[in-house]
Amino acid sequence: MNWLTNVVRPKIRNILRRETPENLWIKCPDSGQLVFYKDVEANQFVIPGSNYHMRMGASARLKSMFDNETWFDVALPEVTPDPLKFRDERRYADRIKDARARTGMNDAVKVGFGKLEGMGVVIAVQDFDFMGGSLGMAAGEAIVRGLELAVEKKSPFIVFAASGGARMQEGILSLMQMPRTTVAVQMLREARLPYIVVQTNPTTGGVTASYAMLGDVHIAEPGALIGFAGARVIEQTIREKLPEGFQRAEYLLDHGMVDMVVHRHDLRPTLARLCRLLTKAPAVEHAKPAPQLPPPAKPAETAEAPAVATSA
């Protein structure tokens, strides 16, 4: 003990270390900027400074689309969880179990039915956090069930695609979901109901070879990666350097592969407007402000009449 400790007594520090949440801050992949997670979440997972569109979970996506943030979760058919008893470095069944615990979802696709600016719509969302949004038996069943429900309800069907492709652990059973979903889309088309695809980052592989490229209208989020094979694979195959921005949403818009690139904040009114146009529904009449009444007239000031002199 020295003279300093005699003057300033050491304080007892907290033995338990204060835990800091891992996702308290987010680093923007585009600018490298550190952003508070709550700010990004409140901004629909768009980085405020750089406008970079982060990946958005299925529940958050549905919440941002439906009126009053309410909808009905559509019950999806049960499938065999591990039909091939697949195993690589880990068992496929264990990977599914971990993905379910991490995301709270049964599989990569979530389907909801609700109101979009007063119009009934069915929306299916792929969650990339669930095994890369890969298309397996359960995801295929979810898409087909969503399309069937849209026909039953006579409502538009909207899908938010986000996937790395078919799920390799399910083999040919996964690839079979491509023609199955294609047939289901044709069923919706025969019912003359709108089918709108929103391609988010990334939309690749077997998904782009099936239902993600069959929409009546294709919308892409800014900067989304959209394509079948990866750019590196294409370059190695054709032995040529690909142009700048190849397979990005803006490049595909310039070359006619998508109809529009829409900021996430503008998606909801854009989708509602498209659904009304394609179903020939009347436009929503927004409540007009009450006409302002003119201010009441001020009462006229009464002046005393001047006295008139009379002669005697």
UniProtKB/Swiss-Prot annotation:
Its EC number is 2.1.3.15. GO terms for molecular function: acetyl-CoA carboxylase activity; ATP binding; carboxyl- or carbamoyltransferase activity. Pfam families: Carboxyl_trans (PF01039). GO terms for cellular component: acetate CoA-transferase complex. Pathway: Lipid metabolism; malonyl-CoA biosynthesis; malonyl-CoA from acetyl-CoA: step 1/1. It is an enzyme of class 2 (transferase). InterPro entries: AcCoA_carboxyl_beta (IPR034733), Acetyl_CoA_COase_Trfase_b_su (IPR000438), ClpP/crotonase-like_dom_sf (IPR029045), COA_CT_N (IPR011762). It is found in: Cytoplasm. GO terms for biological process: fatty acid biosynthetic process; malonyl-CoA biosynthetic process. Transmembrane segments: none annotated. It catalyses: N(6)-carboxybiotinyl-L-lysyl-[protein] + acetyl-CoA = N(6)-biotinyl-L-lysyl-[protein] + malonyl-CoA. Residues 286-312 are annotated as: Disordered. Residues 299-312 have a biased composition (Low complexity). Its main location: cytoplasm. Residues 24-293 form the CoA carboxyltransferase N-terminal domain. Keywords: ATP-binding, Cytoplasm, Fatty acid biosynthesis, Fatty acid metabolism, Lipid biosynthesis, Lipid metabolism, Nucleotide-binding, Transferase. Belongs to the AccD/PCCB family. Acetyl-CoA carboxylase is a heterohexamer composed of biotin carboxyl carrier protein (AccB), biotin carboxylase (AccC) and two subunits each of ACCase subunit alpha (AccA) and ACCase subunit beta (AccD). Component of the acetyl coenzyme A carboxylase (ACC) complex. Biotin carboxylase (BC) catalyzes the carboxylation of biotin on its carrier protein (BCCP) and then the CO(2) group is transferred by the transcarboxylase to acetyl-CoA to form malonyl-CoA. This is Acetyl-coenzyme A carboxylase carboxyl transferase subunit beta. It comes from Bradyrhizobium sp. (strain ORS 278). The gene is accD.
